[in-house]
């Protein structure tokens, strides 16, 4: 997606004056924040797990080359085709060629922030493919030609009335007098529409919460089951993930999974935690005939040599956003690129440059709540200060 980070101040001003957005954001502090607190309190070893998770991620990043090679070796042995992409353009071209080789017309997608980072949907659509988002929040914002405003809740900036209006505008094949007064009715309608997409898709594309070097597996974590249908019903499954997602062992990833859902939504575990290892075997009842993994660098190797390597520990739980007073005031779109909130204020300048995103590290009260709740103990305020120093030294 095109960055509007240089317009952050004007974006924020518009967001503060948007009454519908403010209504949508008003429930955030009392919802996800309270659920995380309750989940933490129910797990006495939560703080110990944070230390363990940090150590695992630091170790993996310190030996990233070793674990990426191990992952590739084991994934290939399990029947995967592993592709390496230096940047967004290369990743887009690799994925498009996979789709073209599969003679694809329809592509279903699970929720993937990396696909947003590389602007994958636009590229595939420009090549004549139909792309259908299957995560409910992603589907809703796709109808509106918008981008996610939150890492785990893409449509959190919308009210129920707005979603109903969009469904009535787009789902014109359904009866006009149908009742859409309750969230469950909206979900049911989306399920019926998306079911047809699953059954006719040629390629399914998902992200990966983690990649396991020990087994060559990828993991997706969802609450809707859309990821499972996306990757198992299409004949070709494509995983697109950044290189920092690799974890050494199954035991390691189990420790981190205990932190992920609790930090994100307050659940002990998400409803679906799915491991994928290679294509369908002869004895398997379902699954893809071809399994591809696209590993994206896009500046992350360069980050490893800087003080910003700590941000690569991020497991995309969104807790920093939920607890951030700035995010709670303006939402995610004001940040102007893929990653909003405190994590975006550090990651975005690291990926696209301080010149383009220098306003974001200034969008902070430096209250420190983001670091207090981060399951990976990323010192986000400290890293924002480093970006601010770079901006000052550049004279911008």
Give short role names for the model-derived ranges.
Residues 70, 74, 78, 94-98, ...:
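Generic, well-ordered alpha-helical scaffold segments in large soluble proteins
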Residues 1-308:
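The feature marks the mature, well-folded catalytic cores of soluble enzymes
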Residues 65, 85, 89, 188, ...:
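Conserved structured core elements
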